[in-house]
């Protein structure tokens, strides 16, 4: 993250642009987030997984900034992870559960020294999240 902004293209950043070009922003977000490329690019990747283990040691201002960023990410994810018939609270709960699975898989994949297992973690989570969301 540079100056608080991601440098890599992500459907999180501009869902309407992905929809305008005929893409499913949820499917693209899942595929991008749970990719070996994102796993390898720690410096420019998701700050939620990059700083999660250290955030409690930050001063109150740093902790507040992390919390604001996480809330913003969850809000963006809830926008692209909509499902018919869900109320606002249900949509947010669904987004939190899905994003938590994705972040946990990315974190575990980054921590594992065995490349085959690291890939298996990403592949399993990607398949599960796609099946639970119906994302293409």
Predicted ranges, named:
Residues 1-5:
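HTH DNA-binding helix-turn interface
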Residues 6, 10-45, 88:
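Hydrophobic alpha-helical connector segments
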Residues 12-19, 37, 55, 59, ...:
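Short amphipathic alpha-helical interaction patches enriched in hydrophobic/aromatic residues
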Residues 24, 59-68, 81-136:
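Hydrophobic/aromatic-rich alpha-helical bundle segments in the mid-to-C-terminal region
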Residues 25-28, 40-67:
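Amphipathic alpha-helical segments used for helix-helix packing
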Residues 29, 33, 48-52, 98-102:
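Short alpha-helical scaffolding segments that buttress acidic/His motifs in well-ordered protein cores
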Residues 32, 50, 76, 107, ...:
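Alpha-helical scaffold segments in soluble metabolic enzymes
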Residues 70-80:
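Active-site oxyanion/phosphate-handling segment shared across diverse enzymes
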